[in-house]
């Protein structure tokens, strides 16, 4: 982990929701041995680090049994105030960090606290929900009674408390220009991260989950493949840049669409790993294509259980289209609120976990 110098900023009022499942971190994932660091991990560690940076921190956790008494003592000894009531925490913070469970619980907590947060507060997701979906779930009140409240991210992109956690991913303006939070609110989130000695990466809100969630494994491998093909296509084959980009779009869109309709197993069945190994092997044109070597090895040694599941899988009807072209068509042919509604509903489906 890079050694990031802490910066001194004005004292902030911070509310963290959720201490983190210590049984999962310590006993099931065995983080102390695998990654290092020391408990408590998760939201409670974030609260500790924010408090140690000089901020006024409240940790809301209704389930005291989620941690042992000695770990709770560590939290309180750091200067964190522990409460069981989300509303009490809501009234406290100018920055609200949701280290909350996957699913409906996070939306329920967000809808509870937004009524009570101070003026110009910012509510930040972590790893259990996309900031885009969080915004959509709160949109009715954000566009009426609480226009002052911003939505961003304070995504650790690692488990807080492990040496790997040296950064936060913060959601900024979306790729289509939507401002879910003001520049001042995003700046506060950046300053909070840096004050705790973390690197702050501001990325488009609708990209944050792709680079910060567990699916970043897929992002990294896919990006490596794209860049490998780009290098080979341009330097060795001398293919036109537009053609390379079009084939990348076709490949990624096809895979994504098949997963959406037919699941992982259905996608694998449609792509036929045996055939893919043969065709992709012919693209091994440089010695340094280590990513392709690794991919071919994985495809040649698929798990027998997965093979059986793929054999039984169904390839369901899938309409393969260029997504951005379809959006333009909908806006042109339908237009207005109907088009925006259809696009928004589709976006929610994309970003929901």
UniProtKB/Swiss-Prot annotation:
Q: Which Gene3D superfamilies match?
A: Hmd, C-terminal helical subdomain, NAD(P)-binding Rossmann-like Domain
Q: Which UniProt keywords apply?
A: Oxidoreductase
Q: A Gene Ontology molecular-function term? A: oxidoreductase activity
Q: Which domain of life is it from?
A: Archaea
- Stored InterPro entries: 6-PGluconate_DH-like_C_sf, HMD_C, HMD_C_sf, HMD_N, HMDII/III, METHMP_Hmd, NAD(P)-bd_dom_sf
Which Pfam families does the annotation name?
A: HMD, HMD_N
Into which family does the record put it? Belongs to the HMD family.
What protein name applies here?
H(2)-forming methylenetetrahydromethanopterin dehydrogenase-related protein MJ1338
High-level lineage: Archaea, Methanobacteriati, Methanobacteriota, Methanomada group, Methanococci
